[in-house]
From Swiss-Prot:
It is an enzyme of class 3 (hydrolase). One of its GO terms (molecular function) is 6-phosphogluconolactonase activity. The modification N6-acetyllysine is found at residue 287. Catalyzes the hydrolysis of 6-phosphogluconolactone to 6-phosphogluconate. This is 6-phosphogluconolactonase. One of its GO terms (biological process) is glucose metabolic process. The lineage of its organism: Bacteria, Pseudomonadati, Pseudomonadota, Gammaproteobacteria, Enterobacterales. Belongs to the cycloisomerase 2 family. It comes from the Bacteria. SUPFAM superfamilies: Nitrous oxide reductase, N-terminal domain.
Length: 331
């Protein structure tokens, strides 16, 4: 398995393309100059395209991915109704979902043969919308509205329209600020990192009809932490055994172990990391974690070690200015 790591650096308007080898070392293979401040990125389900959101002219750009080395070639673009904060796709590669924090909306862009061709739906009134996360069964879109302490739930119709479910939302504790999410591989649990109190909620998906319950909330910060909470990102290993979340104020990654059924998180440790870690990701083998420091302008690679999933630093690399997003593609 070959793996390519993409790093988005909005301040220098670049995507750095790296080869990740089996020992966890990175080799730079391409630097792409992007026509705008590039932030969120996602790889298409068929691994043929990288979709990126840019500002200040709000667009989604599609880059064709070379199958041999992961190199990028511009392919298409489509306008967006707000500044892109987070970007994702459905599992069949029919739609791109874009959450906009500043516009307070989530939009759906239709794809034709992998290329974006236009917005088909927009839902407004999502104050602080920070991500859009399709459920493993491709039915439900989870959309955290950070400033409203709620996660809105939509059914995605065949033509890409978003229909509010019943119930239409679940709520967090006041002041939590739900931000980014991941799902357990067994499809029974979801995990949401809360920006404003640096906690992680565990949501049990009791059935496919919106019967959802928060079964655990865990503080992700050290006991002696007294500064402002500012959590950012969350990811889980492919085997579902280890979960990670980062905080930008403390510049650390919190390490969690996950119970076999996915219902319980246990805090295992803390990894000091790059200054202001805005984004990170786990590779497809589950062996490595790559994190970007928004203020350090570097990325670090860690090996995931042992039963606890603790992090052992493997290497550190300079990238563009203000790196914010990390995507790993296997090909």
């Amino acid at each position: 398995m070959k793996q390519t790591v993409y790093i988005a650096s909005p301040e220098s308007q670049q995507i750095h393309v790296w080869n990740l080898n089996h020992e966890g070392a990175l080799t730079l293979t391409q630097v792409v100059d992007v026509p705008g401040q590039v932030q969120p990125m996602v790889v298409s389900p068929d691994k043929r395209y990288l979709y990126v959101g840019v500002r200040p002219e709000f667009r989604v750009l599609a880059y064709r991915i070379a199958p041999d080395d992961g190199a990028l070639t511009f392919a298409a673009e489509s306008a967006l109704p707000g500044s892109p904060t987070h970007i994702s796709t459905d599992h069949q590669g029919q739609f791109v979902f874009v959450g906009s924090y500043n516009a307070g909306n989530v939009s759906v862009t239709r794809l034709e043969d992998g290329l974006p061709v236009g917005v088909v739906d927009v839902v407004e009134g999502l104050d602080g919308c920070h991500s859009a996360n399709i459920s493993p069964d491709n039915r439900t879109l989870w959309v955290p509205a950070l400033k409203q302490d709620r996660i809105c739930l939509f059914t995605v119709s065949d033509d890409g329209h978003l229909v509010a479910q019943d119930p239409a939302e679940v709520t967090t504790v006041e002041g939590a600020g739900p931000r980014h999410m991941v799902f357990h591989p067994n499809e029974q649990y979801a995990y949401c990192v809360n920006e404003l109190n640096s906690s992680v909620d565990v949501w049990e998906l009791k059935d496919p009809h919106g019967n959802i319950e928060c079964v655990q909330t865990l503080d992700m910060m050290p006991e002696n932490f007294s500064d402002t909470c500012w959590a950012a990102d969350i990811h889980i290993t492919p085997d579902g055994r280890h979960l990670y979340a980062c905080d930008r104020t403390a510049s650390l990654i919190t390490v969690f172990s996950v119970s076999e059924d996915g219902s319980v998180l246990s805090k295992e440790g803390f990894q000091p990391t790059e200054t202001q870690p805005r984004g990170f990701n786990v590779d497809h083998s589950g062996k490595y974690l790559i994190v970007a420091g928004q203020k350090s302008h570097h990325i670090s690679v860690y090996e995931i070690v042992g039963e606890q999933g603790l992090l052992h630093e493997k290497g550190r690399y300079a990238v563009g200015q203000g790196p914010m997003w990390v995507v790993v593609n296997a090909h």
